Amino acid sequence: INGKIGLPMSVTSIGAYAFAKTACTDFSLPDRVTEIGEGAFESCYEFQNLRLPRDLKKIGNRAFNDCLLSGGLDIAYNVTEIGDSAFYGCTGLDKLSLTSSLQRIGAYAFSGCKYLNCELAIPSSVTEIGDGAFQNCIYLNGNLILPANLKKIGSKTFENCKFFTGTLVIPNSVTEIGQDAFSDCSRFTGLSLPNNLRKIEFGAFARCINLTGRLSIPETVKEIGSYAFYNCTGFTGDFVLPSALESIGTDAFANTQNKNRLVFQSLPKGMQNGYHDCKMRRYVNLSDASYVSDDAYAYLDGASYVRTMTNTWGSLVLPYDMLLPSDAPYSVFTIEKMTNDEVVLKRCTFILNPGVAYIVRRDGEEKTLTFSPDRSVEIRMKMQPTDVGNLKFSGTYQAKEVTDGYILAQDRFWNVAKLKAAAPETQAVMVGPFRSWLEGTTANTSPSL
């Protein structure tokens, strides 16, 4: 089949591979056609001019894959779905207009349409954009506006779209940014990440060399993949990693050239490998997320300290002495012995003294623990009318940098020297309020505040 083909007005669908690999140059598609099937016009190398039918609702997978289409492409008003690889490799297209009824753009739908030379307006109705949907659409330009209801940005979705500009704002509905999703998008100048983001995968923003300003990673992020921000050389200021971070991949911040600090607020898996070759000073700031719901209150004629612990183990400092109840749902320990290799605890059975750092273990399922004296005590603290951090007292416990000894965090004793050895350029560990550390490495060393 070759030349120009006209179809009867009664035709309402084009079947799978109906005209694949034919030499037709032009098709007249009736307006009553509602669906174009899988591969219907695949590899029609002579097919150049395309006008989509008025009533079209669905464009199947690979429908126009590898066609030599030219000029602009207007997606018909009623289309709700563009299938996987539907226009893959249509290198002759130079303009693209998407309809407001569109809901899904399939994987690699426009991948390799490298001469599209226009702004990309993705309708707000779109909830799914597949992997590689606009990969290697090199000349797409202007600001990229992503739809507000988008849930996930897949792997390689906008990889190598080199001419997008301005600030990339990822909507708050997005929880995951896929592998190489924006890698080599080298003309973006700003980045705003969503408040509900959980995961940034391998190479997601690699080589986005013109991103500038301070990188703000949301507190909800639990995983940052290898090379996620590789060669992002324009960022300034500290990189403060979220306290919820559980895993960081190899070289996640490699070659960033940033001369400020890379600040860890947790001890994620892979932290010793997460920043090879970057120029920043490494810094650990352990803020104990287990204690965010602490509530301390006191009176001249009595006192009580209520603590919510999500971890089994924690550190404990009281501003008053307290007789340990025999039926307490927790156990309290002092340090019996401490060496480079071990910490030996000794259980307390009678009185806890004020201002001493103890180790507390939650013994049951109850997470809210109450530490109250059996008599009236005087609390020598200045009470504030509003919370200071999550405490109702200020000036009682100080955050401090430590360079040796042990830290109690995430139900483990962490040897500071070994922690620094795993990341040789780490300067210090920051110990926050309600966090004790154990100085030195000799036996019978007392905990410190």
Label for each model-derived stretch:
Residues 337-346:
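Short linear interaction motifs
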Residues 17, 39, 108, 132, ...:
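Tight coil/turn sites that cap or link beta-strands
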Residues 1-13, 23-35, 45-58, 68-81, ...:
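Structural signature of tandem-repeat unit edges
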Residues 268-328, 346-449:
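A short, polar beta-strand/turn micro-motif
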Residues 15-18, 37-42, 60-63, 83-88, ...:
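Consensus positions within tandem repeat domains that build extended binding/scaffold surfaces
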Residues 230-296, 300:
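Leucine-rich solenoid repeat scaffolds
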